[in-house]
Amino acid sequence: MNTRPDKYRYPAFLGLDETTGRYYILFPDLPGCTTTGDTEDEALASAREALSLHLFGMEDDGDEIPAPSPLTGLRGENGEAVTLIEVWMPSFREKMETKAVNRTVTLPGWLDKEAKIAALNYSQILQDGIMERLKISRQVAKLKKRRIGSPA
């Protein structure tokens, strides 16, 4: 059963760093989740990406995700504006879970040379080999890719 929420909404502080001239965003409920931008709009767009990535990491690690603080009573320390950042997770999860990952492989030099001459695609060969070993058909792989991020 999928218990991960589709949507998160967290309060954030938006401020201007006088020394750099860049805008910053801090999430008081999520220590370490911060971002910046050259403009307010850039900082806010970056905040959505940072929040999505931070929460995805917490979900993936099995960490408890804190409830967002109520807006009432929140005040920025240095005159920061308080704003709400909302993220839609299903599409972000799918992007992260279907993202290609790099793997380092080691093979003899002569074999690498022959593979280059034959213009072989290492990634495709490795995927095909792993799917064959795990007895996963291309059709099943496509279905798995489509289902990622959907409720179970």
Positions of PLM-derived features:
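Short glycine-enriched loop/turn motifs at secondary-structure junctions
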Residues: F27-L30, E97-K99
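A contiguous binding-surface segment within folded domains or other stable secondary-structure elements
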Residues: D6, E18-T20, T36
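Short, flexible N-terminal segments of the mature chain
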Residues: L30-P31, G129
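Acidic helix/loop or adjacent segment enriched in Glu/Asp that either coordinates divalent metal
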Residues: E42-A47
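Short, charged, surface-exposed hinge/linker loops at domain edges
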Residues: M1-Y10, R48-T106, W110-A118, Q124, ...
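Short aromatic-glycine-(Arg/Gly/Cys) micro-motifs in beta-strand/loop hairpins
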Residues: L14-D29
